[in-house]
Amino acid sequence: MTNSEKALKMHEEWHGKIETCAKSHVNSREDLAIAYTPGVAEPCKVIARDPEAAYTYTMKSNTVAVVSDGSAVLGLGNIGALAAMPVMEGKAVLFKEFGGVNAVPICLDTQDTEEIIKSVVNIAPAFGGINLEDISAPRCFEIEERLKELLDIPVFHDDQHGTAIVVLAGIINAMKVTGKDKESAKVVVNGAGSAGVAITKLLLTYGFKDVTMCDISGILGKGSQNLNWMQQKMVEVTNLEQKTGTLADALKGADIFVGVSAPNIVTQDMVASMNKDAILFAMANPVPEIMPVIAKAAGAKVVGTGRSDFPNQVNNVVAFPGIFKGALEGRATAITEEMKLATAKAIAGLVPDEELNENNILPEAFDPRVADVVSRAVKELI
């Protein structure tokens, strides 16, 4: 039985990967009177007087909504709200299993930006945080920014920021292995969608000076055509030399490649044209931009992918459960850039210097320390 066949079989058996589990047991009339009417009126009255009391008396204190419109699901594309449900259920499982955070999958049957924003605002009172998931660019940027302005709970688009945080953590350690530094390293980010933009922003915030973005049309610069509004903002702070050309041109003399794009688009010759001991994060799934063995043969020193069957898996699960755990426990109203940087550094710090090597730059997803270390990094900045 293939993994695909097994996944389909297990999903049929599960009939959904999550369920409601009652914390209060109703075994008598007294239990019923306390859990529901008339006793339930007391916490209701307290919350009506003081909305903050919802964190004390309801699930709000440890529950997030996982919200998607199904417009950009994994490698499947725009499959719609209903077909996105298995992914959102899976995300809810990861929140609980890795961070102890309750999560509710909510798939909205609209891809209208205003309707999504209004829907999330209207359900927000029940949740301590909002995790946006698999919403296509550039709408995802506006939706997240608007919701952050409208809500007093954390709003986090994991496809953007979870990816960026783990990439930065990996790069921090990869630079230790290779002896490179952020001041002089030349970085190429291929893919100018949600993940590529967020990765570029976080690398710049961390202190990288020379970052160039590429997409299917090649190097992005101020003269590029058909850029969306976010890409137009990004070309103002990247590609400072205003280089033009293809991805191959961008990679000549580069130190670091980050791919969130398409399979098999980086060749051996491209890697060979990069600086000595190049770092490549080829994260297209399931087939990366270049296979690790090919990249290594061409001279790359450190190679990471999104896959669990290769070393250095760049996996968001080492970030988002702990981030929300910390944000909820600390009652954060937002997840800031400082928190993202601190989280990346905390994740990188989980691999001691003496254990760092080209095949070990990131902690394993199942490392039991991860969520607590990440949550502490977040809480220290609240």
List where the protein language model places each region:
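Rossmann-like adenosine-cofactor binding region
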Residues: Q232-V302, R307-D309
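Short, ordered loop/turn segments at secondary-structure junctions
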Residues: D69-S71, I79, L108-D109, D134-A137, ...
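Glycine-rich phosphate/diphosphate-binding loop of Rossmann-like nucleotide-binding domains
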Residues: L74, A81-G99, H157, I165-A262
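N-terminal ligand-binding/catalytic initiation module
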Residues: M1-I153, S375, L381
